[in-house]
């Protein structure tokens, strides 16, 4: 059995006054991520997609014996006219993933500060099939730490809708299934690739790369004009990043009936936890994200 892991890593030398850390601040995240994949009980090949080449040895991870690690540099020139063009680095891995679709048994796409412990992978393997046969998505919760307390980063309200599935109780996450990564087996990935949703423009907002207005006046074949209109229609450039990391789990896509999490000891199964290593939301005060404790997520 083989797993392909695709990580988007935006390399920036300087640290600006915003939430995006520079490359050297993020190296410890990548090191922790790589060291964990080295413990997985199957071959894990890691592909790091970046805008700038760097020496992998600078990460100072343990000797990797569980597969290969490959750095792939991408040019973002085709997105030069888009607002927030750097966010579109998150789209760059799609071509490679499509080429690999029959070479691996499982696929993960993740952002560069997402830590997926082995027990979370085992949780997915154990529960995914029961969910898929009922057209449900098995959910995860992205966890952040504040004062050593675990908070759920992506939910601003508790979840409370329960359901039974094959004599087991689940809770429905109809608030926000996003957790900055996705995981699918080869069968599910190939279904996605054959669908219209493999084109991320069908997930990223309501903008269309093909403009009806340009078509009417005979200018639809000019890519610069198409890019400008698409960028204008999509007001939040960071939603390009979210479109890549949500996979086919989005609430408005209709691919699955719901995203669900199994109940264990009156709370969600603790193995559903994956970790946002930057701990950003739990330590900011501008939103309600990251304010609900993990052990209180079910109301």
Task: Go through each PLM region and give its residues.
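A conserved hydrophobic helix/loop-capping motif in glycosyltransferases and polysaccharide synthases
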Residues: 4-23
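Active-site-proximal specificity loops/subdomain of glycosyltransferases
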Residues: 54-105
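Short beta-strand-to-loop acidic/aromatic patch adjacent to the donor-nucleotide binding site
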Residues: 104-115
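Short, acidic, metal-binding catalytic loop of nucleotide-sugar glycosyltransferases
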Residues: 23-44
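Short beta-strand/loop segment that forms part of the nucleotide-sugar
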Residues: 43-53
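C-terminal catalytic/acceptor-binding lobe
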Residues: 195-299
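Phosphate/oxyanion-binding active-site loops and adjacent basic polyanion-contact surfaces
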Residues: 19-30, 81-93, 116-120, 177, ...
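Conserved catalytic core of nucleotide-sugar-dependent glycosyltransferases
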Residues: 86, 117-216
């Amino acid at each position: 059995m083989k797993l392909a892991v695709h990580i988007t890593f935006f390399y920036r030398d300087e640290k600006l006054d915003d939430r995006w850390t520079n490359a050297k601040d993020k190296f410890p995240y990548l090191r922790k991520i790589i060291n964990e994949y080295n413990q997985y009980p199957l071959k894990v090949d890691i592909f790091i997609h970046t805008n700038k080449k760097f020496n992998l040895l600078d990460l100072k991870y343990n000797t990797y014996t569980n597969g290969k690690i490959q750095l792939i540099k991408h040019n973002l020139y085709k997105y030069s006219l888009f607002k927030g063009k750097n966010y579109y680095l998150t789209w760059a891995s799609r071509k490679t993933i499509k080429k690999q679709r029959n070479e691996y048994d499982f696929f993960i796409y993740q952002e560069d500060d997402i830590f997926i412990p082995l027990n979370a992978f085992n949780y997915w393997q154990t529960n995914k099939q029961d969910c898929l046969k009922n057209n449900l998505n098995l959910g995860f919760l992205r966890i952040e730490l504040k004062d050593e307390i675990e908070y759920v980063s992506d939910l601003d309200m508790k979840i409370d809708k329960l359901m039974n599935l094959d004599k087991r109780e689940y809770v429905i996450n109809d608030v926000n299934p996003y957790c900055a990564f996705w995981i699918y087996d080869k069968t599910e990935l190939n279904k996605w690739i054959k669908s219209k949703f493999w084109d991320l423009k069908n997930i990223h907002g309501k903008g269309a790369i093909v403009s009806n207005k340009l078509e009417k006046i005979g200018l639809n074949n000019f890519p610069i004009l198409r890019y400008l209109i698409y960028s204008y229609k999509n007001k939040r450039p960071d939603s390009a990043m979210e479109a890549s990391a949500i996979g086919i789990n989005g609430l408005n896509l209709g691919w699955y009936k719901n995203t669900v999490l199994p109940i264990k000891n009156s709370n969600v199964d603790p193995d559903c936890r994956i970790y946002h290593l930057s701990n950003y939301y739990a330590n900011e005060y501008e939103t309600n994200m990251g304010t609900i404790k993990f052990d209180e997520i079910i109301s």
